[in-house]
Amino acid sequence: MLDTWVWGTLTLTFGLLSSLQGVSFNETANTCDILNCPKGFTCCVKECCPERKVWDPANDRFRFLVILACIIFPILFICALVSLFCPNCTELQHDVRRVDHQTPIEPPSIAPLESIWVTSLDPPPPYSQVVQMTPPTEPPPPYSLRPEGPAGQMRGRAYATL
């Protein structure tokens, strides 16, 4: 009877110890190690998972859009700043020109009237006004297949044998 009490106490003690650690036989069998995972897999919490590369196209489909946004947004920001300060820069350039008396102020260039194009918002004229019809003429005279000279003689060399 004493032996039964010892075996029961040992079983109870080891059972409580294993439950306190939270480790069972099934969990130790499912945990993986770096050596146990095949190539291309890494050890996750309880199993081997495929490796994820940071810029793998299968994992990140929007890589191109992210790179494009990282390039375009700073350029747009710089352009907005330049357009914000651009009128001030042109006024400063004119002020510098006026302060410096050695450089003459150039008058604005005037384009000749021939090079100025004016667009109107009116609809275009009808086709009959744009295309000028030629007056009807007489039909051309009929043509002959044989060329003739001024007096009805044949042109070219005359062969003595014919």
Curated annotation (Swiss-Prot):
The signal peptide here is: 1-22
Q: What broad class describes the main subcellular location of this protein?
A: membrane
Localization: Membrane
Indicate the transmembrane segments per the record.
Answer: 64-84
Q: Which sequence ranges are listed under topological domain Cytoplasmic?
A: 85-162
Membrane topology reported for the UniProt record: Single-pass type I membrane protein
Region Disordered: start and end of each range?
A: 134-162
Q: Which Gene Ontology cellular-component terms appear in the entry?
A: membrane
Query: Could you tell me the keywords of this UniProt record?
Result: Membrane, Signal, Transmembrane, Transmembrane helix
Q: Which domain of life does the protein's organism represent?
A: Eukaryota
The residue spans the entry assigns to the Extracellular side of the membrane are as follows 23-63
Which protein are we looking at? Transmembrane protein 92
Organism for this UniProt entry: Mus musculus
